[in-house]
Amino acid sequence: MSIIDNRKAFFDYHIEERYEAGLVLEGWEVKALRAGRGQIKEGYVVVKNAEIFLIGTHISPLPEASTHIKPDPVRTRKLLLHRDEIKKLIGKVEQRGYTLVPLNFHYKGGRVKCEIGLAKGKKLHDKRETEKKRDWEREKARIMRSAT
């Protein structure tokens, strides 16, 4: 079950491979995600010291968040992957044009997971082509509905 989707990633990038990573979260972040108070549209993934981090995602704290901590909604969060997956991703990201983008947050076995995608950026004409295809599919569905 998906908590948050990054639909903009599919518009801006060609997703070539997908990986499921664990997230290192604090308790208030999990509660906020369960309440649907997260946003990953501005997020991106970086590699530092053979570790992978999620930067720029926004998780708004609930108003009932604890009084003795100051929640940081856009803090850097560590992603958990197997060592061989990290090495493979590092090799691919160092190639020209590849980047890592968060695709969605979802639950798996009661834990919050982040699906990341190995992606290549789309050019402007590719984005226009995608938009034309989407419009045509919508128009085709409208015609089919009116014909029946």
From Swiss-Prot:
Species this chain originates from: Burkholderia thailandensis (strain ATCC 700388 / DSM 13276 / CCUG 48851 / CIP 106301 / E264)
GO biological process: trans-translation
Region of interest: Disordered: 123-148
Cellular localisation: Cytoplasm
Pfam families xref list: SmpB (PF01668)
Domain of life: Bacteria
Keyword RNA-binding included in the entry's annotation: yes
Basic and acidic residues composition bias: residue spans: 126-142
MF term (GO), any: RNA binding
Organism taxonomic ancestry: Bacteria, Pseudomonadati, Pseudomonadota, Betaproteobacteria, Burkholderiales
Annotated family: Belongs to the SmpB family.
Protein name: SsrA-binding protein
